Amino acid sequence: MDAKLNILNQYFGYSSFRAGQEKLIDAQLAGRDAFGVMPTGGGKSLCYQIPALLSDGVTLVVCPLISLMKDQVQALKKVGVPAAYINSSLTPNQIRRAYRNIEDNMYKIIYVAPERLLTDSFLSTISRVHVSIVAVDEAHCISQWGQDFRPSYLHITEFLNYFEHRPVVSAFTATATPQVRDDIIHYLGLQSPVYVVTSFDRPNLRFDVLKPSSKEGTVIKLLQERQDKSGIIYCSTRKDVDNLTDTLLDKGFAVTKYHAGLPEVERHENQDDFIYDRRSVMVATNAFGMGIDKSNVAYVIHYNMPQSMEAYYQEAGRAGRDGSEAECILLFSARDIITAKFLIEHSSENEELTDEQKTQVQKQAMQRLVKMISYCRTSKCLRSYILEYFGESHPESCGHCGNCNATMEDFTPQAKIILSCVGHIYAMLGYSVGITMVVRTLSGSREERVLNLNLDTLAEYSQLSKYSRNDLRDMITCLEALGYLRTDPEHLGISLTRRSREVLVDGARVTRAVEEKAAKEKKSPEKSGKKLSKEKDPELFAVLKNLRTQIAVEEHVPAYIVFSDATLADMAGKKPASLDDFLQVSGVGSVKAAKYGERFIAEIRDYIAVNPKE
């Protein structure tokens, strides 16, 4: 067997690589720099862990997140890989001990925070060992144009200059615009890197956008239907996190919370409660989750609209990391737009940026917000919208998202009135106005600004007054998503496009999604061509989960570190009767087979004895 495949199987329990992994691994093993852009849950970590195990010396992994370092090192140690992390969570004595171990060549993989790179003690220690690879995780943090710019990442550039013989440098990110990708290559000094961008499609994720009258009531209903599953609920503000958590606790749900305003000790305790499955639901701001590799998250609910598609897809992508079917549900209201704009306008406080750079960053953030709003209001396939945003083509319908399972309504007459109104406002004023002013005109508002601009004299004034303002906003944003309107990213004025003529003159019909079909009419994942992992024997699956929990408690590790839900589902389906059979289960390598095989096989044997096949 090929050496890298042998490592993949022996340590990680998989028989084949995912898209893009092998090319990136081969590049580093051949001494080439590498740059991988892969979605959250796409298997980025294996792209540097396997080369590390097949290379002389040590691999340094630069990572901004204490939680991710802890998680990755814990998982590596479980499969017998000597690994360590160095960050501010360690005491001075622990750091000194780690440095001694590094000098004694006791580790193959060392995770390090970027702030640590240029310290005298770290530089002195690293100078005494052979570093074969420097892997940069969350590489988009090096770009001031990225949504998570961290000035400490710029230390990596200077750190690399300390090496007399430059190691292989690899970079990985789940989200990066062309400008951010250029920055990554420039600041890291990547030398003719092997560049891989894999598909951003996550077939096991089901996307939906809901517009409920009561978000709180909707969340309660969603959680009642998912009582036995683990999930994350993202809120835009700390206040929403606190209020929603209190409400859900009062209703008896096993929830905890996380945001930057909590004391550090409480944050860590709450995070551990979620990771160790003591609490099934985490309510949090976006301060939570980056670097959390909890594989059994069955759903991610966004209580508010995020500020960008990049942020949304990264956060939603924390569901279904083990390949199991998972849900990504966004609860949208017009108030979310106001909150998002406020947060953007008050986010440019990075002292590392000039005023001009801050203005540019804010402008780009507003452009991303426009696309995020369109996602919330589009009637087209949500999966297609996401993939097109990230530069991929995709069939018009996935047959599996909320919009694909929705009833379509022809609203051509209303669309013509809206387009005419937008065109006539521009013709009369000489400039475009925002969506709010168009809605007020169409609904017949008598507000002062409408009258001052003489918008009540237009033929379209009050023609759509029977519709709610939210409904009118949905229609307008749907027209934008379909390409019949556009929003100026700087001034947020809406205007006609070349395609507007298709509706106004050429007779094109326009439809939008208005409600989801009955559940029985929804296409199953299998029918839509998306084969999703499901346990074939639910009762045995539950038995195996209980055993996994026992082992996790005994070893003081999260349950998913022992085996993922997807591995247990495959185990329940295959019912291995020997260690050789056990090794055929996806996600079981030789180390875990030797450690846990007999206990799981015995549990399966006992289950079959009590539940023989009919």
Task: Give the predicted meaning of each segment.
Residues M1-K4, I338-T339, N350-D355, Q364-M366, ...:
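Accessory DNA-binding and partner-docking regions appended to nucleic-acid-acting proteins
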Residues D2-Y11, S15-A19, K23-S45, L53-S55, ...:
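Helicase motor core with emphasis on the C-terminal RecA-like subdomain
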Residues Q28, L223, F274, C376, ...:
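Short helix-to-turn junction characteristic of helix-turn-helix DNA-binding domains
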Residues H165, Q227, S379, Y431, ...:
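Flexible coil/turn residues that form the inter-helical turn or adjacent wing/linker of helix-turn-helix
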Residues Q360-F390:
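Short, charged low-complexity linear segments at domain edges
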